[in-house]
Amino acid sequence: MHLTVREEERIQLWSAAEMARRRLERGVKLNYPEAIALICDEILERAREGSIPMLTDMMEYGATILKKHDVMEGVQQMMKIVQVEAMFPDGTKLVTVMNPIRD
């Protein structure tokens, strides 16, 4: 099977996000890379399925995925911005989420 670099990156992101989901289910707090992976994967999946078609709505959704109690101490302060290119029904857009982990 031959994958493009973008496809390989997407698989790696999904894998990290799945690990993060499993850890959250067990009550384990997420570290920085796990939190980034989970937020990005959720945004990419919602954009792909078209359930959140507006960019501004997706930016708001990105800030609801994780809360402060879901991540290790200090992760919320380190994560000021998350950006990911997502494929929407009308094309690729850069989704920017400011302060993605809220109280």
What are these regions (language model features)?
Residues 1-83, 87-103:
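Non-transmembrane, aqueous-exposed alpha-helical and coiled segments at domain scale
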